[in-house]
Curated annotation (Swiss-Prot):
Subunit structure: Homomultimer. Interacts with envelope E protein in the budding compartment of the host cell, which is located between endoplasmic reticulum and the Golgi complex. Forms a complex with HE and S proteins. Interacts with nucleocapsid N protein. This interaction probably participates in RNA packaging into the virus.
Organism: Avian infectious bronchitis virus (strain Beaudette M42) (IBV)
Gene: M
HAMAP family per record: GAMMA_CORONA_M
GO CC list: host cell Golgi membrane; membrane; viral envelope; virion membrane
Protein name as it appears in the record: Membrane protein
Residue ranges annotated as Virion surface topological domain: 1-20, 73-77
GO molecular function, one term: structural constituent of virion
Disulfide links within the chain: none
Primary location recorded for the protein, binned into one broad class: virion
Subcellular location: Virion membrane; Host Golgi apparatus membrane
Keyword terms of this UniProt record: Glycoprotein, Host Golgi apparatus, Host membrane, Membrane, Transmembrane, Transmembrane helix, Viral envelope protein, Viral matrix protein, Virion
Function according to Swiss-Prot or TrEMBL: Component of the viral envelope that plays a central role in virus morphogenesis and assembly via its interactions with other viral proteins.
Length: 225
């Protein structure tokens, strides 16, 4: 007679377990749905921050579950699959940190650790203020706007400024490149009192190099002073 205990749940036990925890499961799934669907930097920074935390937790959770699967495999085939998936999860997680650290060294922005993208936009205003923003890819054109004295780019609130504060060049950094955008067009309203209420600027991609933002200086001042 075997001394091992059979821990397999039958159908009735599974149904009973679901009935006991269905409210928690519903609330948890609703929370994830709201976070993933409405978590955009252009909508709510609070929900977006929660979304980033959830995404950060997914890789360690995947690795932990993979390790458990390796320790308690259902069979030999399951063990091989668990090892492959766990190694893939570990390599992906390490690769994320390597790329994020490289990007952080280039632009010195905490947006570098955004798990949704691999690029950070940067605008150094002529008043010395540094504005960084999340961007999903490296576009050919960037169009920041000023509305009611507030600077927006890619739909994100950046800072309060005047049209004269926009620089000639802005940047989009990736782990291995610095993309330089040159101002090619600007519109600062009409001759009425709307001049300071609305302005739009067009920056076209000018060149690409491997420099860091620390090498950029405006008026003899370091970028981070």
């Amino acid at each position: 007679m075997s001394n091992e205990t059979n821990c397999t749940l039958d159908f009735e036990q599974s149904v009973q377990l679901f009935k006991e925890y269905n409210l928690f499961i519903t609330a948890f799934l609703l929370f994830l749905t709201i976070i993933l669907q409405y978590g955009y930097a252009t909508r709510s920074k609070v929900i977006y921050t929660l979304k980033m935390i959830v995404l950060w937790c997914f890789w360690p959770l995947n690795i932990a579950v993979g390790v458990i699967s390796c320790i308690y495999p259902p069979n030999t085939g399951g063990l091989v699959a668990a090892i492959i998936l766990t190694v893939f999860a570990c390599l992906s997680f390490v690769g994320y940190w390597i790329q994020s650290i490289r990007l952080f060294k280039r632009c010195r922005s905490w947006w570098s650790f955004n798990p949704e993208s691999n690029a950070v936009g940067s605008i150094l205003l002529t008043n010395g203020q540094q504005c960084n923003f999340a961007i999903e890819s490296v576009p050919m054109v960037l169009s920041p706007i000023i509305k009611n004295g507030v600077l927006y780019c890619e739909g994100q609130w950046l800072a309060k400024c005047e049209p004269d504060h926009l620089p000639k060049d802005i940047f989009v950094c990736t782990p291995d490149r610095r993309n330089i955008y040159r101002m090619v067009q600007k519109y600062t309203g009409d001759q009425s009192g709307n001049k300071k209420r609305f302005a739009t600027f067009v920056y076209a991609k000018q060149s690409v190099d491997t420099g860091e933002l620390e090498s950029v200086a405006t008026g003899g001042s370091s970028l981070y002073t």
